[in-house]
Regions:
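A broad, structural micro-motif
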Residues: 26-28, 74, 145
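Hydrophobic, proline/glycine-rich low-complexity stretches
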Residues: 1-44, 158, 162
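Flexible, active-site-adjacent loop/turn segments at secondary-structure boundaries
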Residues: 26, 82, 137
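A generic structural signal for short, non-catalytic loop/turn and secondary-structure boundary residues
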Residues: 21-26, 72, 123-127, 165
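Short amphipathic
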Residues: 124-137
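Structured core of small recognition/catalytic domains
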Residues: 144-167
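HotDog/MaoC-like acyl-thioester-processing domains
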Residues: 34-124
Length: 167
C-alpha cells in the first residue's frame, strides 16, 4: 500500500524524491484496511490508489485491492497523510506548497465504501501490557517506527491462544 502511494505521488510530482529535495517528507498518520475476502496464495491482484481529498495539513488516500481477471474486490483501505518539514518536523501547508496542484489529482467521487477513520482515543482501561524496545531495524527514513514493524509490535501484544481463538 505504502509503495503504491509513493509510485502514484512520484508520477504526479510530489513523491519522496521531489519532497526530499525541498526538505519535506510524507508521514503516514492513519491507516485502515478492510478485507472482505483474501486472494489465495499465488493469485494475482491489482492495487489501485487515488487521492480522495487534499486539505491544508493532510490528504486522504484510498486503495482498492481487486482481481485483474474478474474485477472482484477483495478489500479497501483508507489512509491519512501529512507532509512535514524534515528539519523542524512542522506540518507543511499543502495548498501553499503546491499551489492547489494536488487538488487536481483528487477523486472525491471514487467509491471507497469502508468507514472513514477517526482519531484513536485513549482507552478507558489503559492497562499496561508491555514495553516494546525499538531497534535500529524498526526505524524508517523519517526516524519513526516503520509501518510494518508497528503492525508487528501490535500483533505481538496478543497471545497465540488469542489468535487461535479469534481466527
Amino acid at each position: 500500500l505504502l509503495n503504491s502511494a509513493e509510485y502514484h505521488a512520484s508520477a504526479r510530482g510530489f513523491g519522496m524524491k521531489a519532497l526530499n529535495d525541498a526538505n519535506h517528507t510524507w508521514v503516514l498518520s492513519r491507516l485502515t484496511i478492510e478485507m472482505f475476502d483474501m486472494p489465495v496464495v499465488h493469485t494475482n491482484f491489482v492495487l489501485s490508489t487515488w487521492i480522495e481529498n487534499v486539505y491544508r495539513l493532510f490528504t486522504n488516500r484510498n486503495y482498492r485491492i481487486s482481481s485483474p481477471e474478474t474485477g472482484k474486490v477483495y478489500g479497501y483501505a483508507r489512509s491519512v497523510w501529512a507532509m512535514i518539514n524534515y528539519a523542524d518536523r512542522l506540518p507543511v501547508d499543502l495548498h501553499l506548497m503546491h499551489g492547489q496542484t494536488m487538488d487536481t489529482w483528487a477523486c472525491p467521487d471514487e467509491d471507497c465504501p469502508i468507514e472513514k477513520q477517526g482519531r484513536v482515543r485513549p482507552l478507558a482501561d489503559d492497562t499496561f501490557v508491555k514495553n516494546v524496545e525499538m531497534k535500529y531495524s524498526d526505524i524508517d527514513y523519517n526516524g519513526h517506527v516503520n509501518s510494518i514493524k508497528y503492525i508487528e509490535h501490535i500483533c505481538d501484544l496478543f497471545s497465540l491462544d488469542y489468535y487461535k481463538e479469534h481466527h
